[in-house]
């Protein structure tokens, strides 16, 4: 516990002193890549992904224990009529994950990925952000700490995803608070909001950011006031992965909002992360650009559940396999360029 005892203090300390990449491992990976049986740069981003893996894991690129972590939370703001689905769907989908019936289950089977689902007090929705803070500082910090446990069982590639009715409204509010513009710039259909419902969603984001406006110069305050339990837990998981130098793939619009909190707190906080895909949610590409990232995939998906990050994990696994498994020119007896 920090000396002052304020719940966020330990996280502020971690964010000030983040570990960096392994320079030696990066050099070794680049040297090996130069000897593989291909022209320099011929594998495009696969080469950069292999270098990224080497730099953060400190070893030859390999993905042996990939894990998808899904964090599920409910939101008080849903009572504003901003989504066509009731909050009970969050719990029902968690049960669907457990039964193996969701899209993410099929992708995990196809790509041999582990899956963990974290139920974040679904019977107790966060505060309605148009009327009050989503969470107290203590509850938000405790949820971040809980999210950090995502890596406890061991992983060498963490895919971050979520489930929560109403959470694209939350993500829009966070992005609006961080980056400005207008609420309309950041609000999209989510699970199918349109017409008057979409207008209510925009109005809710505007009202929430206005209500909390005097406290939005601190990223962690943005998270606790405008966020949700899955936002806090994802931020905690990403931070825990950084402390252990575990590479991270971030999923869609909501997961990117959680990542944005960390980036706002420390500009280097997402150096160990890649964005798995750009979703069909209108604000996602702009949010990714604000992070200075380029997504690996663009498939028009907007499901959440970590599905885009999980699909991207297949690409990361292929990048590692190419780097580690390809023959060198000398091994293959192939002439290198003069």
UniProtKB/Swiss-Prot annotation:
Its EC number is 2.4.2.21. Gene3D superfamilies: 1.10.1610.10, 3.40.50.10210. One of its GO terms (molecular function) is nicotinate-nucleotide-dimethylbenzimidazole phosphoribosyltransferase activity. It is an enzyme of class 2 (transferase). InterPro entries: Nict_dMeBzImd_PRibTrfase (IPR003200), Nict_dMeBzImd_PRibTrfase_bact (IPR017846), Nict_dMeBzImd_PRibTrfase_N (IPR023195), Nict_dMeBzImd_PRibTrfase_sf (IPR036087). SUPFAM superfamilies: Nicotinate mononucleotide:5,6-dimethylbenzimidazole phosphoribosyltransferase (CobT). Keywords: Cobalamin biosynthesis, Glycosyltransferase, Transferase. CDD domains: DMB-PRT_CobT. The keyword Iron-sulfur does not apply. Pathway: Nucleoside biosynthesis; alpha-ribazole biosynthesis; alpha-ribazole from 5,6-dimethylbenzimidazole: step 1/2. Coiled coil: none annotated. This is Nicotinate-nucleotide--dimethylbenzimidazole phosphoribosyltransferase. It comes from Rhizobium johnstonii (strain DSM 114642 / LMG 32736 / 3841).
């Amino acid at each position: 516990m920090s000396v002052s005892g304020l719940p966020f203090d330990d996280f502020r300390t971690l964010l000030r002193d983040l570990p960096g990449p392994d320079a030696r491992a990066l050099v070794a990976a680049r040297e090996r890549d130069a000897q593989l049986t291909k022209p320099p740069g011929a594998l495009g981003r696969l080469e950069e992904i292999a270098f990224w893996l080497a730099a953060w894991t400190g070893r030859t690129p390999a993905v042996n224990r990939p894990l998808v972590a899904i964090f599920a939370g409910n939101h008080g703001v849903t009572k504003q009529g901003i989504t066509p689905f009731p909050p009970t769907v969050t719990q029902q989908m968690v049960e669907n994950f457990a039964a193996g019936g969701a899209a993410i289950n099929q992708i995990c089977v196809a790509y041999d990925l582990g899956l963990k689902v974290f139920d974040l007090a679904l019977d107790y929705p966060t505060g309605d952000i148009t009327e009050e803070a989503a969470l107290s500082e203590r509850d938000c910090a405790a949820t971040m700490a809980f999210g950090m446990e995502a890596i406890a069982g061991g992983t060498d590639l963490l895919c971050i995803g979520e489930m929560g009715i109403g959470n694209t409204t939350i993500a829009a509010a966070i992005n609006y608070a961080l980056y400005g513009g207008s609420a309309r710039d950041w609000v999209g259909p989510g699970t199918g909001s349109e017409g008057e419902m979409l207008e209510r969603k925009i109005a809710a984001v505007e009202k929430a950011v206005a209500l909390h406006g005097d406290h939005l110069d601190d990223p962690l305050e943005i998270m606790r006031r405008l966020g949700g339990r899955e936002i806090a837990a994802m931020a905690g998981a990403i931070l825990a992965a950084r402390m252990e130098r575990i590479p991270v793939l971030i999923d869609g619009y909501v997961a990117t909002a959680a990542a944005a909190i960390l980036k706002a707190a420390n500009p280097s906080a997402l150096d160990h992360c890649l964005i798995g895909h750009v979703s069909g949610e209108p604000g996602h590409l702009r949010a990714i650009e604000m992070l200075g990232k380029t997504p690996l995939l663009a498939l028009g998906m907007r499901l959440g559940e970590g599905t885009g990050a999980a699909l991207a994990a297949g690409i990361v696994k292929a990048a590692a396999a190419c780097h580690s498994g390809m023959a060198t020119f000398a091994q293959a007896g192939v002439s290198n360029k003069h």
